[in-house]
Regions:
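N-terminal Lys/Arg-rich, disordered targeting/topogenic segments
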Residues: 1-10
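Active-site-adjacent structural segments surrounding the nucleophilic cysteine of cysteine proteases
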Residues: 12-13, 17, 24-162
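Conserved active-site-adjacent core of cysteine acyl-enzyme catalytic domains
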Residues: 2, 24-56, 95-96, 140, ...
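Compositionally biased, intrinsically disordered low-complexity segments
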Residues: 5, 18-19
Length: 264
């Protein structure tokens, strides 16, 4: 047992030494070299293996990927391209021209490269930005204002204290912040008819959701309409969830609060 520990320690020091040599040669930072050399010591998730393989193809270190983005890919495979492209991200002007439509609420994804790499609160907007993204979807649909983007709303939220550390976007972003943006957020009871009436009147509905189909913690989604008695949903974190109809019975027990949004 003691001998095994000594051998293990020997390998550790050998890898540390190799990492330092690579760093000294300018091949990569010591911490990145250490991450690459020690990667296969433990069992890895599919997301980690995907990122590692892509990093090797591109001649970069897996250390260039923030842990939170790898975990995002673990939770949501839809984000693969967004996560893999992180080291090659470039600042780009936001272009909403592809979303222009007077009769359809646009689906903004919080992990869209146009804004998803921006920081919002404690992490990337791609991870923490469901609230601003939902408010942006509703606001842009109702007003056509191209400043109603997830990035702009996220900055507005931080400036006005609507981001709560360790929690995310507070409900006040919707109930209070909407008014500062020229919108009105009316809280609704958990009654299907009230929700249907609001949607049929052209008012998108923001839902604060608890654990269930959309999240393991907390999340915001947007109801955009009614079809065959079920709700059309814009989930800012999932194209898949946004492509199907959701019955009231499916989501009822997951709803924590409800706001109908209209122009103020």
């Amino acid at each position: 047992m003691i001998e095994t520990k000594k051998k293990s320690a020997g390998w550790v020091w050998l890898i540390i030494g190799a990492a330092l040599v690579l760093a000294a040669l300018g091949a990569k930072p010591a911490w990145y070299a250490w991450l690459d050399l020690s990667f296969y010591w433990t069992e890895r998730t599919e997301a980690e293996l995907t990122v590692k393989a892509y990093a090797e193809e591109q001649g970069i270190s897996i250390g260039e990927y923030p842990r939170s983005l790898i975990e995002l890919l673990e939770r949501n495979p839809e984000t693969q391209d967004f996560v893999l492209n992180y080291p090659f991200r470039e600042a780009a002007e936001v272009d909403l021209s592809g979303y222009e439509s007077s009769d359809t609420v646009p689906l903004f994804l919080q992990w869209d490269p146009q804004w998803g790499y921006e920081k919002y609160g404690s992490d990337f907007l791609a991870i923490t930005g469901c609230g601003p993204t939902c408010l942006a979807m509703a606001g842009y649909y109702l007003t056509g204002d191209e400043n109603m983007t997830p990035g702009q709303i996220a900055r507005f939220a931080e400036k006005n204290g609507y981001y709560e550390s360790g929690y995310g976007s507070s409900w006040k972003l919707i109930s209070e912040g909407a008014g500062k943006l020229g919108l009105t957020a009316t809280e609704l009871p958990l009654v299907k008819k009230k929700m249907v009436d609001a949607l049929e009147a052209g008012k998108p509905i923001i839902l604060a959701m608890g654990p269930g189909d959309f999240t393991t913690t907390g999340h915001y989604i947007l109801l955009t309409g009614v079809e065959d008695g079920a709700f059309r949903v814009n989930d800012p974190n999932s194209v898949e969830n946004s492509q199907r109809l959701w019955s009231y019975e499916e989501i009822e027990g997951q709803i924590r609060n409800i706001w109908a949004i209209e122009i103020g």
